[in-house]
Amino acid sequence: MTTEGDVLKLKVPYPNIKSGLAQKRHMYIFAERREKGKGLFVCTSKKPKHSKKGVPPLNRFEILPEEVPRTKSPFLRATLVDCDRLFFLSGVSVPLTLLTHPRCICREYLEKILQIKKNNQECEIIPLEINSIISLNPSLNLKVQNTDLTLSS
């Protein structure tokens, strides 16, 4: 079972199935659980272009591995958590094989990321289409929906 703070490695069909996020696995932080599913923020390696003002992600949290013990984060390089978009994954269960090692970020980081999201009134909510996400990540499992079936004797 996944919990808030876990870091997953997924291919995501955004903005479409041919995009960079769909071609190569990226890390996503499981930030919040709602009725509509799991909210995930994409992570990206920090690049020189990110030092310039106005370069997306505009709302971001930076993780610098050299400043924290390895147990607080699975990231090996300077990483930006993109708080401009929150992807929602629903109707699937995530196997442990898609989690990083260590599997999560520390609580302190998660709280800071959620505060950035709270302060960002324009955070885009993006629901992920279940068939596309499963076709890119076959180890994801469809969740069985509870139904009110009456069993006859």
Which stretches of residues belong to each language-model region?
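Compact nucleic-acid interaction/catalytic patches
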Residues: 17-25, 30-69
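C-terminal terminal-subdomain/extension
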Residues: 63-153
